[in-house]
Amino acid sequence: WFGVPSCVPATIMETSGAIIDADETARLLEREDLHFLAEMMNYPGVLNKDPEVMRKIEAAKQAGKPIDGHYPLATGPKLKAYIESGISTDHETIYLEKGREKCELGMHVLIREGSAAKNFDALHPLLKEYPEQIMFCTDDAHPSFLNKGHINRMVKKSLDLGYDLYDVLRAASYNPAMHYKIPAGFLREGDSADFIQVNNLKDLTIQATYIQGTCVYDGEK
């Protein structure tokens, strides 16, 4: 499941292989296989209402697709203005109080564990405080990191800390599927049959993985 890049190039100070402007962004957002506008890193452009940035945000709104954020140290009026522009998530939250402020303003916080940034230990109390607004994610995850687990690693850590099973599973699966309007994970008629089979609801060791109804992993290969 993919989104449309919002900042290509990431800054005006680099030479990129391509430029995705607001017109191209709008065209990409019309595609059914692209589900959101990704990581609006240009928060100065949002706060200063840069015309090109705002056209990209408006294109996502017109397409009915959510807009991912990137504003780690945001607070106060600037954070409120950023959210009011239509940006609904942030995966760059580092501090618990910042996470609480974002949730109080209606934002969804993605708790991140990656090869570089690891924020679970700081942010996990949000699971209990705002279960409807929390999601798990990875970011810049190297193969060696993924060999030790993906979202399931955060699920296990949460359960070891005593969090409610259904709040944890909600952050791992239900909340993301609902927020990004992804037709998977519910096993409803017409949805893609994408699911995993685990040994039990405590260890959550993956025994099999199914994608579109086909077993792609059976515990051995």
Question: Where are the predicted features?
Answer:
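Divalent metal-binding pocket/active-site signature
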Residues: 39-97, 113-117
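Histidine/acidic-residue-rich catalytic or RNA/ligand-binding cores of hydrolases
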Residues: 49-50, 76-84, 101, 105, ...
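Divalent-metal coordination cores built from histidine and acidic residues
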Residues: 1-66
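Short acidic/histidine-rich active-site segments
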Residues: 91-92, 110-117, 130-149, 190
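Hydrophobic faces of well-ordered beta-strands that scaffold small-molecule active sites
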Residues: 2-4, 36-39, 67-69, 89-91, ...
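Active-site microenvironment of metallo-dependent hydrolases
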Residues: 146-162, 166-221
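Glycine-enriched alpha-helix->loop->beta-strand junction motifs that scaffold or abut catalytic
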Residues: 33-34, 64, 81-89, 103-110, ...
